[in-house]
Amino acid sequence: MEGWEEVSILAAILYSFPASKDPVTSLLFDSVHNLLWCGDSSGSARSFTPNAGYPFQLYPYTKFPATTSPLPVVQQRNHSRGILSLSQNCVNLNSRRGLSQATFTAASVTDSANVLRNLSCMTTLGTGNDIIVGGTHSLGSLDMQKCVATGFDHSGNLSFVDSVAKTLVLGTTDGTVELFDTASNSSVKSFPAHSGLLSDMAVQGNYIATCGYSARRRYDHKNSSAAGGTSYITDPLVHLIDTRMMKSLSPIPFPNGASFVRFHPKLPNIVIVASSTGVLEFVDIFDQSKLNVYQVNMSPASPGISRMEISDNGEYICCSEGRSLHLWSFTSDTNFVNFPAPLEEQDIPAPLPPPFEVDDPVPLSSVGMPYYKDYLLSNYATDMVFTKELSKVPAEVDTSLGHGAFVPYDRTAHGPRNISQPYQSLREPPGSNSNAPRFISERDGESNENMIHAENSIFHLKSPTSVPHCYSRLQIQYSKFGVDDFDFDYYNKSNGACSGLENHLDNSYTNALLQLYRAAPAFYNSVVESLLPEYLPNGPEIISWNPQGSSLLIELGYLFDMMHKAEGRNVKIANFSQLLTQSASAASAGVINTDEEKSLNADGLREIIIRFNHYLLSELTSNQRERRHTNSEKIEDIMGIKLEMQIKSQCTETETHTGSQLIFDLTSPPEQYLNKLAMLRRAEKTEITILSYMDYFMDQYKSASCRECEARGRPHAVNARQRVVRLPKVLSINLSMTNFELQQIHNCRGWLVPEFHIGEDERFVDAGRGRKYELLGYVCEISHGPGVKRGAHNLVSFVKIKGQWYLFNDFLVMPIAQEEALNLSYSWKKPVIIVYSEPGQDFSYFETSTFKKIQDLDTSIIYRDHFVRAAREGHRQEYKLLTKQEAPEIGTLIAIDAEFVVSEPEQLEIRYTGTRKLIKPKKLTLARVSVLRGNGPNIGVPFIDDYIVWTGHIEDYLTSFSGIEPGDLDPEVSKKALVTLQTVYRKLWLLLNMGCVFVGHGLQNDFRCINLVVPKTQVRDTADLFYLPEFKRKLSLKFLAYVLLKEKVQTGNHDSVEDAYTALMLFQKHEELTRTGDLETVLYQVYMEGQQRRFRAP
C-alpha cells in the first residue's frame, strides 16, 4: 500500500455553538453516490462531493438537522432510502437531499423495552428494514416498517455493534467482544479484547479487529502503595479475532497507540491502523513485516484525530481533526465508489416574462382589462359591509380522556352542570386586566376606586370555573420610559419580606424553583458561603467555552445574596441565565429555553423543570468538589439520600451495595398497590397522601432468576432489596407523573401533608416521635386550557417563610392561606417538585458590620489585577490600585460609572397605524467599569478601570456613548487589559458587602444591567439628588456639570473615569449646598436655566 498522500484538507464546520472539543462526531463514505458525510455535535449532518473538473476539491452538497434535538450525531449508516443518523434518543432517516423520511423515537414507536434510550451504536441486519441499536443497558431491534422496537436479552453497556452473517458482533464498554445470536436471543461467545475501554472495532468477512485502552492501577511511589485509582492508557496492540475458529489471533503491534482500525474493503488481509496523533499504518495480518507508515499533517494546536473512515472502493481515507477533515488517496480518480450514481441537482425555475413597466408617464389604465358586463367587486357598496362579532372557539378535547374506560364529569374542573355560562367575547379575553396599573407614570391619573377594583381582581384567589388572575402568565410592559416605569412594587404584597424575579429573560422558567431553594436555610448557606474563597479562572481554554469565567454555583450564590439585599425589590437572573445558556452541559441536558416557554406545552414545561432540578443539583455538587475546602456544608451532604441494596442468592453470598442520590424521583405506584390503599382507606378511614406513595418506593423488593444456575439445570431466584437508609436535611422530590396519574392526586383530599416524622429505621411514624420534616414548599404547573397548547402554561411556587405561605409567580409575590396553598383539588394545579426540610435551621446572611470578619473570606482581588491574558505591549495603566492601608470601611465613598454595548437589538411591534410598541428591550452587556476613590488623600484617583472580555455577538458598540471601539473586548485583537465578568463582579460585590457608599449618575440603570442590588442607604445618585419631582424631568450629567461646576464634559466619546469623577464633584457640590441651605434655591435656578437652554449644554 504505497503512494498514499494527503490530497485535501477541508474545513467541514466553520463554527459550532455551543463550543465543543469534538465538533465532528461521525464520518461516513456514501455507498451509492460520490458523497462524504459527517455529523456534528449540534445534531446537523453535512455532505461533500468532489468536482470532476477540479480533483481533490470537496464542495458542500447538503446540510440538514439529523436529530430531533440539538444532540450530537453519534453514528451514520448507508441505507437504500437515504442516510441513517443515530443520536442519543432517536434514529432518523433522511434522503440524500436532506428531506426527512422517518423519525423513530421512544414516543413514536412501540417501545415497551425502552430500546430507544441512551443509544450509542447501530447497524443494519438482513433486508435493511431491521435496525439493530445498542446503548446503555439495552440491545434491541427496530422494525422500520411496523414501527416496533423489540429488546434482546442482553445486559451491559455497548459501544459498538456490527454483524457477521446473521450473528451480531458487540463491543462493550469493558473491552469485551461478544458474538450474539438473534435467533436464540443469547450470547454465543465472548472474547476479552482489552482490559479497559474499546476505542474502535472493525468487521470484515470472518475477522474482527479491535483497539482500545488498558486499565492501570495508580501507585504512590513514595509510599510504595496503591493510590486507589485506575487510569487508562492507549493499548499498543490491535486485537484480532477469527469467527470461524472462534479464537483470538496474534495481535498486531502498534507502538504509537492504536485508536482507530479499519479493514481494506478490497484487500481483506490489509488492516489500516491510526493513532490519535495522526500516525497511519497499513499492515498485512498474515505477514506483519509488510507495513507502510504515514503521518497526517496536523495543526500545532490540534485536539487529535477523532474519527477515521475508508471509502467502499478502498481508494480514499478520511480522518477528522477538530472541525477539519483530512482526505488521503493514492490515485487521481475522484470517485469514492466504483460506479457512482448521478447526484440529484436543484430545480432551475423558468425565467419570468419581462415586467410591464408602469411609471409616472404611463397610466395604470394602459394595462387593459377584459370585457365585462357586471359590476366589479371593487365597486361593492359601503352600506352592504357588515361586521360580525367573533364567535367563541370550541374547547379542544382533553387528550387524557382516553386513558380510562369511564371518565366521570369533573365538577372541580368544569363547574356545576346544566348552568349557562355568560358569553365571553374574543376581543376581551378572560385574564386581561385593563384596570391593573402597569406604569408608574400612570399613578397620578388613577382614582382610588380603580386601584381597589384592580387589586381585588388580580389578587382574588377564588374562581369557580377558571384560573384566578394571580396564577396567570405575567408580562412586563414597556412604556416610553423603558422598564423602569413598570410598577413592579404593585405586584409584591410581601411588605419587603420576599423579592420577585423578572421573567423576560432566557430560562425564566427556573424562577419558581430558585425561589423554593432560596427559602431553604441549609441550601442557601451552602451556596452563598461558596462566594467567600476566590474562584476566578481566566485561562484561554476557559474563555473559549466560559467567557464569564464563572460557574453555576458562583452565579447562584450571587443571585441568592442579591435576593436577600433586594428587600422586596424585583431581581433579574441575567448573569445566571447567561451562564446557563452558554453552557454546553446545559445544552446536552436539555434545560435551555430561549423563547420564554412559548414552544413548551404542559408536559414539556413539567419535563424541563424536572430535568433542570437534576442538572442544578448535580452541577452544584460538581462545582463544590472542584473548589478548595471551606467550612460550609456541601450540597451532597445536605440533600444526599443514602440508599442500600442487598442481593441474596443461593449460589453466592449476600452482597450489600450503598450509594446516594440527590433527588427522590416519585412516580405513581402500581395499580394493585393503589387498589390496596383504597380498600384500607374505606376500612380504616385513612387518607391516601404523598407518604403512601413514598412508603412504596422507599423499601422495594425485586426478584429475578439466576441465569448461570438456570443454564446448569438448577434454577432459583435472586432477591434484591433496595431501601432508603437515611433521608437528608432537605428532601427534594420530583413528581414524574402523567395527567391521568395527577388526576388521582386531585381526588385525594390532603394528599400533600404539611409535615411528617421519620423513625430510626427510616420509616414513617406518628407525630412526636423521630425526626420531623416540614413542607418547605413546592413548584406546580398552572394549566391554562388544553395541555397540548404551547406557550399558554406557566410555573409558580408556594413557599413557607417564617410560618407564612407565599405565592411566587415570577415578579408577583403575595401571602396566601395554608388551606389554599395545600389544596390540590383544582384540575389546573399540578405539582411538579416538592421540598421538605428539617426545621430549626437558620440563615447565614452577609451583613456589612461583620462581613470582613468572616472566616475563609478572600478580598485580595480588590488590591491586584487579574487579566485574562498578560497586559498588552504598550498598555498604559491609568489607575492606581488600592493598598491595604486604604482598605474600604463602612461608609467609604467610591465613585462609579459603567459603559455597556448592545448584544441583542430591541424587538418592536409596528402596527398598521404607524404606532410602535416595544415588545422586548435591547440587551446590554457590561463592557467597562471604573471606580474612583471618594475620600482620602487620593480622592478622585481610580483604582478599578476594567474592560470586560466578550466573545459573543455585539449588535452596537454605542461608541459615542460608551467610548468602546470595535475589537476592544475581543481577547484576540484587543489592546486593552481585559478581565472576565466574574472578576469585576467580585470586586463590586466585595465593595458592596464591605459597606462602601456608591456615588454616580443614573446608578439605577447601571446596577440593573450589572445585576447588582445595592441597598438605598449605600447609594448616592446625583440624578436623584438634583431632581425636583414637580418638573418630572431628570437632568443629565453633562448639563449639571456645565451649570454647577462650570465645566464641559463628554465633549467626545464618553469616558467612564471622567463621568465618575464628575459625579463625585457634583456630590461634593450637593453636600456643600446642603450645609449652606441653598440647595433648593440653586436647584430651581438650574431648572429655570435648563428650560431656557432646553436642558442642553453648549
From Swiss-Prot:
Renumbered ranges of WD repeats: 19-58, 150-190, 253-293, 300-338
Domain USP: 466-839
GO CC aspect terms: P-body; PAN complex
Catalysed reactions listed for this entry: Exonucleolytic cleavage of poly(A) to 5'-AMP
Activity regulation (record text): Positively regulated by the regulatory subunit PAN3.
Annotated stretches, region: Disordered: 417-442
EC number(s) per entry: 3.1.13.4
A biological process from GO: nuclear-transcribed mRNA poly(A) tail shortening
One GO MF term attached to the UniProt entry: metal ion binding
Binding site for a divalent metal cation: D897, E899, D1006, D1059
InterPro entries, per database record: Exonuclease_RNaseT/DNA_pol3, PAN2, PAN2-PAN3_catalytic_subunit, PAN2_N, PAN2_UCH_dom, Papain-like_cys_pep_sf, RNaseH-like_sf, RNaseH_sf
Compartments reported by the entry: Cytoplasm
Record's keyword annotation contains Cytoplasm: yes
Stored SUPFAM superfamilies: Cysteine proteinases, Ribonuclease H-like, WD40 repeat-like
PROSITE patterns, alphabetized: USP_3 (PS50235)
Cofactor(s) essential for the protein: a divalent metal cation
Xref: Gene3D superfamilies: Cysteine proteinases (3.90.70.10), Ribonuclease H-like superfamily/Ribonuclease H (3.30.420.10), YVTN repeat-like/Quinoprotein amine dehydrogenase (2.130.10.10)
One Pfam assignment: PAN2_N
Exonuclease domain ranges (all copies): 894-1067
Subunit structure: Forms a heterotrimer with an asymmetric homodimer of the regulatory subunit PAN3 to form the poly(A)-nuclease (PAN) deadenylation complex.
Family: Belongs to the peptidase C19 family. PAN2 subfamily.
Functional summary from the UniProt entry: Catalytic subunit of the poly(A)-nuclease (PAN) deadenylation complex, one of two cytoplasmic mRNA deadenylases involved in mRNA turnover. PAN specifically shortens poly(A) tails of RNA and the activity is stimulated by poly(A)-binding protein PAB1. PAN deadenylation is followed by rapid degradation of the shortened mRNA tails by the CCR4-NOT complex. Deadenylated mRNAs are then degraded by two alternative mechanisms, namely exosome-mediated 3'-5' exonucleolytic degradation, or deadenylation-dependent mRNA decaping and subsequent 5'-3' exonucleolytic degradation by XRN1.
Protein name: PAN2-PAN3 deadenylation complex catalytic subunit PAN2
Gene responsible for this protein: PAN2
